[in-house]
């Protein structure tokens, strides 16, 4: 797991762990890494899938995931934005989210919230 407790761009290595925690008392924006950097970290090809859990149960404010370069919210996330496209994670006992990252090439991926 990697801890990100202040607004930042997540590194490809942090996202590749599959588990990010945040315990910040302030609202925190975490930007997904570029498709190029994350693709290189994972040695991704079209069809590579990574599940990422963001754990904000120890935080006191929301975490907002921000789409980075060469990443887009998936079609499911766009058409059903309130669930599959929700990039905000509450704090406290309900503060868990799971995102599925699906690569369309070695340098580009889509993001879907799956839990």
Annotate each predicted stretch with a short phrase:
Residues 95-97:
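Short strand-edge motifs at loop-to-beta-strand transitions and within beta-strands
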Residues 1-87, 103-115:
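Exposed extracellular interaction/assembly regions and N-terminal maturation sites
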Residues 99-101:
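Flexible glycine-rich surface loops and low-complexity tracts that mediate binding to linear polymers
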Residues 87-93:
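Short proline/glycine- and polar residue-rich coil/turn motifs
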């Amino acid at each position: 797991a990697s801890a990100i407790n202040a607004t930042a761009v997540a590194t490809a290595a942090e996202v590749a762990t599959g588990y990010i925690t945040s315990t910040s008392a302030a609202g925190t924006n975490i930007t997904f890494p570029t498709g190029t950097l994350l693709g290189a970290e994972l040695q991704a090809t079209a069809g590579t899938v990574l599940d990422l859990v963001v754990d904000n149960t120890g935080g006191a404010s929301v975490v907002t995931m921000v789409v980075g370069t060469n990443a887009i919210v998936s079609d499911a996330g766009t058409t059903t934005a309130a669930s599959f496209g929700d990039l905000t994670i509450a704090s406290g006992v309900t503060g868990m989210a799971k995102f599925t990252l699906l690569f369309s090439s070695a340098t580009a991926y889509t993001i879907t919230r799956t839990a």
